[in-house]
């Protein structure tokens, strides 16, 4: 294992820090810290501290200018709309906020979140057919869908409208429908929104187009803050502004289910911060989709019934305790498996570990902990019969998405980000996948100092 840490101190040119101190009107300690982080323009520093200019025009976000009139038409015609989300905290928050926002605008809307263990990740052809049979005539995805080409084609065949909102990386081809995503069209000035942040920007544009009361946006900004922090997107630019506003809203105690969950998690809403969301709230919301079905988390966020809120918050708290126990067991087994690898495999700079009996909803968090120990990009695969469901985590120096692309011929499905991704692989291909991934990672990381930076 790679051990030890390296100390990296960014330079602080005294002239730059002094200029920031004087022209931005800030203290020397803050000026030094900002200089070390690359800030040099007093005007930029002032905008960063006041967050002026951090909120961007939603019409620049992918195909938002096309999607918004489609939504307006669906609302006016009372077209049945389904918001198709994902089972993590970001996806659940995005589903809740868009359902609440559309309902406030008069839409006939229902949520749909797939099961991790049945439908799996993303918009599936079967889901499109099921929603069509249930009367849905417009599907809006949140936090997923950017690679769902077959599902988009099936929606078109059935006459079901489709709008995709997503923040994940896409392949060479895109689904044939309006796509609202920071990575699409290249016109949006900020590329690191989470799924809920992306859905919020679409709602922001829709509220303006409908000339509706902007308090609709205030009512869901708390969900954007939770998702932004829980999904670990950078807290800069628009993310920072949205998270700050959302944390303030949480402190006002406006969402019943969240208020109850905070009490159970022993978090004081009046002084809530990103740490409390990341370590107390996010894991409890994620636990539902990891171990059972994310509907419990969604219902908690949307309920107005005190009894239901208490029951659901207790359920999520119990699931989170179960998740921790399962996680600890898998971590022990994964590290033992790594230690049993031949020395030549341990020397390679990419790791794939797999086993029967591992919980597919937990392997992602365990992969993060393995990365902390071995300092290599790691994919953990939970085997179930002839297929395995895996999740990977990476280091700053390695693009996991590109690493999986190098193994695409061995994978059934894959997708995600530079730092985190998911895979489906046939059991018979796991060994070949492990070799190919390790070889690619070794090629890309040879000579790179993999010790964590302090």
Predicted features, each with a name:
Residues 2, 10, 14, 19-137, ...:
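Hydrophobic helix-and-loop "lid/oligomerization" segment in the mid-to-C-terminal part
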Residues 5:
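Catalytic domains of riboflavin
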Residues 131-134, 141, 145-233, 239, ...:
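Conserved phosphate-handling catalytic cores of large alpha/beta enzymes
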Residues 447-449:
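Short, structured loop/turn "capping" segments at alpha-beta junctions
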Residues 451-454:
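Short, intrinsically disordered, charge-balanced linker/junction segments flanking boundaries
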């Amino acid at each position: 294992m790679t051990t030890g840490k390296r100390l990296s101190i960014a330079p602080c040119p005294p002239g730059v820090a002094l200029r920031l101190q004087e022209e931005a009107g800030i203290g020397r300690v803050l000026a030094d810290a900002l200089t070390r982080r690359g800030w040099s323009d007093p005007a930029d520093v002032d905008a960063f501290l006041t967050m002026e200019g951090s909120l961007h025009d939603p019409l620049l976000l992918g195909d938002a200018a096309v999607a918004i009139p489609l939504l307006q038409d669906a609302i006016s015609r009372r077209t049945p709309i389904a918001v198709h989300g994902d089972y993590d905290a970001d996806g659940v928050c995005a589903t809740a906020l868009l359902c609440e926002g559309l309902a406030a605008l008069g839409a006939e809307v229902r949520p749909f979140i797939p099961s991790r263990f049945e439908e799996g990740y993303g918009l599936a052809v079967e889901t499109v057919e099921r929603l069509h049979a249930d009367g849905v005539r417009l599907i809006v995805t949140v936090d997923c869908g950017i690679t769902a080409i077959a599902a988009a084609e099936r929606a078109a065949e059935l006459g079901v409208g489709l709008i995709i909102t997503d923040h994940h990386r896409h392949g060479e081809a895109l689904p044939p429908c309006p796509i609202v995503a920071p990575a699409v069209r290249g016109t949006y000035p900020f590329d690191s929104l989470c799924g809920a942040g992306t859905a919020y920007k679409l709602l922001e544009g829709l509220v303006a187009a409908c000339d509706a009361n902007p308090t609709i946006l205030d009512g869901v900004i708390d969900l954007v803050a939770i998702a932004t922090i829980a999904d670990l997107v950078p807290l800069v630019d628009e993310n920072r502004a949205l998270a700050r506003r959302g944390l303030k809203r949480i402190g006002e105690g406006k969402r019943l289910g969240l208020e109850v969950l905070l009490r159970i998690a022993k978090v004081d809403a009046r002084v809530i911060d990103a740490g409390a969301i990341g370590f107390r709230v996010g894991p409890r919301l994620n636990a539902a989709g990891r171990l059972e079905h994310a509907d419990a988390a969604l219902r908690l966020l949307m309920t107005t019934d005190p009894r239901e809120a208490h029951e659901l918050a207790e359920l999520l708290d119990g699931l989170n305790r179960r998740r921790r126990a399962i996680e600890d067991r898998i971590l022990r087994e994964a590290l033992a498996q790594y230690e049993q690898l031949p020395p030549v495999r341990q020397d390679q700079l990419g790791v794939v570990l797999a086993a029967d009996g591992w919980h597919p909803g937990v392997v992602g968090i365990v992969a993060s902990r393995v990365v902390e120990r071995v300092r290599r990009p790691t994919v953990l695969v939970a085997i179930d019969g002839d297929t395995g469901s895996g999740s990977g985590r990476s280091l700053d120096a390695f693009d996991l998405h590109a690493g999986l692309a190098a193994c695409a011929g061995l994978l059934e499905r894959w997708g995600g980000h530079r730092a985190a991704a998911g895979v489906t692989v046939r059991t018979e291909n796991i060994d070949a996948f492990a070799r190919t991934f390790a070889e690619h990672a070794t090629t890309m990381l040879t000579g790179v100092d993999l010790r964590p930076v302090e």
